[in-house]
Amino acid sequence: PDYDHALRPELTVRMIHEIYDAGIFPTVWKIEGSDDPKFYDHAATAISTYDKDSRIVTLGRNETLEQVCAWIKAGAQNDAMIGFAVGRTVFLDAIKKYISGQYTNQEAIEEIGRNYFTLYQTYKNAKTHE
């Protein structure tokens, strides 16, 4: 089966319950991305069962910028989502190009900045238009 759509949603909710049942109460949950708004709804419902103030950020998982933007748009529809936590999605390609000599230091910096700004704008626009 397709892990991201068939298994991840159920496993995420189960993991949330198991962590709370173990006595751990995260302030912010870093949850792997999904392009299905219902995924975030189910996660937020499970979280709010234990803690009405806990929130969600979506992870980048080293996916493409386009994919992470789709996840941000899907998640931003839920009030529990407060942002994103990305790393490799923003910088990995630019760093590889810099190391291989395809980019100057300045070009790498500019690409990383553009990538992060794209994610920020996507989140801001999705939250503004919810």
Predicted regions and their residues:
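Catalytic-face loop-and-helix region of soluble metabolic enzyme cores
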Residues: 31-129
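Active-site mouth loops of central-metabolism enzymes
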Residues: 1-10, 63
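Amphipathic, alpha-helical segments enriched in basic
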Residues: 4, 15-18, 56, 70
